[in-house]
C-alpha cells in the first residue's frame, strides 16, 4: 500500500541497517571491534534518568477511590436516634417494590432476553446457510 516509504519491518531496511553497522576496515587493514561500537551506541541510547518525585502520603480515602466496596455506614451519634423518614424523590418507591418489577407487576419481561436472542440468532444463521446452499445447488 505504501508506495513511497518502506516500513521498518522490510528486509531491505534491515539489510541497510546491517551494512551501516559494519565499519569499513581501518587504514592498517584491521576491522574495528564491534563491541566498542555497541558500547558507544548503548551510551548514546541511554535516556537521561528521570527525576524521582518524593512519595506522597497515602491516605485510606485515596486508596479506596477505585474500590467497589461501599463504605461502612456510620454509627448514629446517639443510640435512640431514628433514621430519617423517607420522603418523595429519595428512592423510597424503588426500595419498597417487593416483586422486583416496576409497579409491583412482577419481573421485567426483558430481564432474561439475552439467551433467547442468542438462540434466535443461531437459528436465523442456520436457516440462511441452508437456504443459501439450496439456492446455489439449484443454480447448477
Curated annotation (Swiss-Prot):
* Residues bearing the modification Phosphoserine: 10, 78
Q: Which UniProt keywords apply?
A: Cell membrane, Differentiation, Membrane, Phosphoprotein, Transmembrane, Transmembrane helix
User: According to its UniProt record, where is this protein located?
Assistant: Cell membrane; Endomembrane system
Membrane side Cytoplasmic: residue ranges: 1-115
Chain ranges passing through the membrane: 116-136
Question: According to the UniProt record, which cysteines are disulfide-bonded?
Answer: none
What's a GO biological-process term for it?
Answer: negative regulation of cerebellar granule cell precursor proliferation
- Residue stretches of biased makeup (Basic and acidic residues): 35-46
Establish whether keyword Transmembrane helix is in the entry.
Answer: yes
Biased composition (Polar residues) is annotated at 1-10
List every stretch annotated Disordered.
1-111
The record describes its membrane topology as: Single-pass type IV membrane protein
List the GO cellular component terms: endomembrane system; mitochondrion; plasma membrane; vesicle
Q: Where is the composition biased (Low complexity)?
A: 71-81
**Topological domains, Extracellular:** 137-140
Annotated family:
Belongs to the CEND1 family.
Q: What is this protein called?
A: Cell cycle exit and neuronal differentiation protein 1
Amino acid at each position: 500500500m505504501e508506495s513511497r516509504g518502506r516500513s521498518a519491518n522490510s528486509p531491505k531496511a534491515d539489510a541497510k541497517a546491517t551494512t551501516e553497522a559494519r565499519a569499513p576496515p581501518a587504514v592498517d587493514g584491521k576491522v574495528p571491534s564491534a563491541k566498542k561500537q555497541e558500547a558507544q551506541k548503548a551510551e548514546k541510547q541511554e535516556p537521561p534518568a528521570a527525576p524521582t518525585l518524593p512519595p506522597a502520603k497515602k491516605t485510606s480515602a485515596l486508596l479506596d477511590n477505585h474500590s467497589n466496596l461501599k463504605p461502612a455506614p456510620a454509627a448514629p451519634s446517639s443510640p435512640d436516634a431514628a433514621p430519617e423518614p423517607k420522603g418523595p424523590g429519595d428512592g423510597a418507591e424503588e426500595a419498597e417494590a417487593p416483586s422486583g418489577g416496576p409497579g409491583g407487576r412482577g419481573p421485567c419481561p426483558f430481564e432474561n432476553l439475552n439467551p433467547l436472542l442468542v438462540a434466535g440468532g443461531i437459528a436465523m444463521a442456520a436457516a440462511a446457510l441452508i437456504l443459501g446452499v439450496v439456492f446455489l445447488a439449484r443454480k447448477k
